[in-house]
A protein has these predicted regions:
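A short, conserved beta-strand element in the Rossmann-like catalytic core
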Residues: 18, 129-131
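Short phosphate-binding loop-to-helix
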Residues: 74-120
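Residue-level signal for inorganic ion chemistry
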Residues: 38, 113, 127
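N-terminal glycine-rich phosphate-binding loop and ensuing alpha1 helix
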Residues: 2-71, 80, 85, 119
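Conserved core of the sugar-phosphate nucleotidyltransferase
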Residues: 132-173
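Short beta-strand segments
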Residues: 13-14, 81-83, 123-125, 152-159
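Short glycine-enriched, charge-decorated loop/helix-capping segments at active-site entrances
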Residues: 25-31, 96-100, 170-171
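Short beta-strand-to-loop acidic/aromatic patch adjacent to the donor-nucleotide binding site
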Residues: 119-129
Length: 173
């Protein structure tokens, strides 16, 4: 295995249960050979230079995820790590409120992966398409060492008008 300890890592939030969608959208086949949207992101990220990927998933979807997207990533030569987003992974002194069943969101997902992230990293959603340019921009930025107190965070942004579909709106529930 290559030494990838200091090369940028791609962290992918893929723990969603797809309740509105009706299934696991992060592994749903959309491409002509059964590719998921995430497979396209992994391809583009790998071409941009990312060698290590951390999938943040739930134990409930582990088998389905590992046998599809996880297997594709490993076959493509990516170093794959897993982190598990569970409700009880919280900072010291915090507890899960009685009756809480939904995950805490983005920050909690990243916290869940803290033990397997050991280098500068980029975060994406498993069910969004970003395109190769996005991965090239973020990989090159992180590789250039733009981290530390002066540059603690970075994001790739897009003009809203360039991202809205002409085919209609998206309902968030």
């Amino acid at each position: 295995m290559k030494d990838t300890a200091k090369k940028p890592i791609l962290v992918i939030m893929a723990a969603g249960m797809g309740s509105r969608f009706g299934g696991l959208k992060q592994i749903e086949a959309v491409g002509p050979a059964g590719e998921a949207i995430l497979d396209y992101s992994l391809f583009d990220a790998h071409r941009a230079g990312f060698e290590t990927v951390v999938f943040i998933i739930k134990h409930a979807i582990e088998d389905a995820f590992k046998s599809t997207v996880g297997a594709h990533a490993e076959k493509a030569g990516l170093n794959v790590r897993y982190a598990y987003q569970e409700l009880d992974i919280l900072p010291e002194g915090f507890t899960v409120p009685e009756g809480r069943i939904k995950p805490w969101g983005t920050a909690h997902a990243i916290l869940s992966a803290a033990d397997v992230i050991d280098a500068p990293f980029a975060v994406i959603n498993a069910d969004d398409y970003y395109g190769r340019t996005c991965f090239e921009l973020i990989y090159n930025y992180l590789s250039a060492g733009h981290t530390g107190p002066k540059y603690p965070w970075v994001m790739v942004g897009y003009l809203l008008g360039n991202t809205v579909s002409t085919n209609g709106s998206v309902s968030r529930g």
